[in-house]
Amino acid sequence: MGKVIGIDLGTTNSCVSILEGDEPKVIQNPEGARTTPSVVAFKNGETQVGEVAKRQAITNPNTVQSIKRHMGTDYKVDIEGKSYTPQELSAMILQNLKSTAENYLGDTVDKAVITVPAYFNDGERQATKDAGKIAGLEVERIINEPTAAALAYGLDKTETDQKVLVFDLGGGTFDVSILELGDGVFEVLSTAGDNKLGGDDFDQVIIDYLVSEFKKENGVDLSQDKMALQRLKDAAEKAKKDLSGVSQTQISLPFISAGENGPLHLEISLTRSKFEELADSLIKKTMEPTRQALKDAGLSTSEIDEVILVGGSTRIPAVQEAVKKEIGKEPHKGVNPDEVVAMGAAIQAGVITGDVKDVVLLDVTPLSLGIEIMGGRMNTLIERNTTIPTSKSQVYSTAADNQPAVDIHVLQGERPMASDNKTLGRFQLTDIPPAPRGVPQIEVTFDIDKNGIVNVTAKDLGTNKEQNITIQSSSSLSDEEIDRMVKDAEENAEADKKRREEVDLRNEADSLVFQVEKTVKDLGENISDEDKKNAEEKKDALKTALEGEDIDDIKAKKEELEKVIQELSAKVYEQAQQAQQQGQEEQGSQDSTVEDADFKEVKDDEDKK
């Protein structure tokens, strides 16, 4: 097998690495830098990628940054009369990294391991694979960024068992994963995160502050000026980086705008304490997934042996302090947060090619997967934090008599109701032979491959007819959706429980109506017209109640119908017992006559003797 490169496709910066011997090596780009800005620019039909594209972003409106935030969505960028998808733009960045690796190796590269945030959903993972394909790369593996970081950190530490927390705050995404390392096995215990939180947001709070201060002083709103905003973005990013090393920085942007009396200049001094005040809510947002990951792993902070910081945003002193305070441990400083993920990807590439031996990586799926069932509920087949690859099957049936098809609504999330979770896809299994409800057996199978990509199959066990779908979602998970999936599951536990009970009640009532109809039909003439009429009335009353929203009324009507069916069952049972008893008496009478005859016959014989 040829060389397989490791790529960290980041929101703000990307990095490429290769395994040399048994050590991962980061490859410098033509400018001599070890990371490449994830920026693409178009000018007069020419495409520019990296530092050269970033440098002219202020003057060129056809510059695209942070496209990773739109992966897996239907977002498009219109430039010079052409629409570009996030996959196409990401492919341009990947092509640049591929070229960097080829120049270094002096050989063609066509295989790669690419990293993604652990909390990327299936559509986002698929989009990343597609970007690789467009770039001319066969994506051997999609690997989670925190897992890759742990591989790079722990490759030479496999003799001792330890539990590691990876805190990955990148340019546009945030992940936290907990792994157990030992005997060459890297097992992910849990993962949590936020796909819409990263360094860009820290830049934005500085931009908002600068816009606000400038407006107070000059009465001009810079947020309406695209070129001014780009200059502010560059200045904010630089100030953020400066404040990781110094306690105060000067932001100076001459000729940022113009007023009635001529040019206006922006001159603001920003202190580290002011920046920390502005970014406080963002830092707090990283703590909730950290606690969630610990909870899901079943670990306390004292059981964590090492904390690894990944991503450029972890250089912010306030972030480091927050992690230290939360975990009670000084973060490990032995890895480069900008390069460690790409290095881990190169190690995984080495595992695939066989160059790295005795290393086993066990990753997990970040969110639960299931399908919608009767009553609008989500039935979970694969729980979040399940080790992948994995497969799980469950048998379902039809909800109506002679139902010719079933709709399979594939969901991802943690809430009990389907509508509160993320739709990954829908497909239909048709040509189900006519049969009473509950009789057909439909086996639904979820397969998650090593890349975390989902394949769902539905099979009619009666006919062996099969239908499947590989999830290719067209929309990403927003902050609100992720909150609904994970955090709201706990916050709305009581409301969820009530809705779950309501759905269960409706399903039980619906099943009871069907049972009564079947029982009355089966009994036929064995029940009186009066009993039949009473059962029909109570059944119709429950059906009417089910059409309404009054839960207490449904419960009351259900109890009345249950009482009726119990009485019917009791009567039928009594009739059956009476019939059986009568049959036994008749049989007993016949048996008795036979015994008398035998007895007399014996007696006659004795008399003759």
From Swiss-Prot:
- Do the record's keywords include Phosphoprotein? yes
Enumerate composition-biased segments (Low complexity).
574-587
InterPro entries in alphabetical order: ATPase_NBD (IPR043129), Chaperone_DnaK (IPR012725), Heat_shock_70_CS (IPR018181), HSP70_C_sf (IPR029048), HSP70_peptide-bd_sf (IPR029047), Hsp_70_fam (IPR013126)
Phosphothreonine modification sites are: T173
GO molecular-function annotation terms?
A: ATP binding; ATP-dependent protein folding chaperone; unfolded protein binding
The record's induction entry says: By stress conditions e.g. heat shock.
- Keyword Oxidoreductase listed? The answer is no
Q: Where is this region: Disordered?
A: 525-554, 574-609
Q: Which domain of life is it from?
A: Bacteria
What are the protein's UniProt keywords? ATP-binding, Chaperone, Nucleotide-binding, Phosphoprotein, Stress response
Which residues fall in a compositionally biased region of kind Basic and acidic residues?
525-542, 597-609
* Protein family according to the UniProt entry: Belongs to the heat shock protein 70 family.
Under which name does UniProt file this protein? Chaperone protein DnaK
Print the organism lineage.
Bacteria, Bacillati, Bacillota, Bacilli, Bacillales
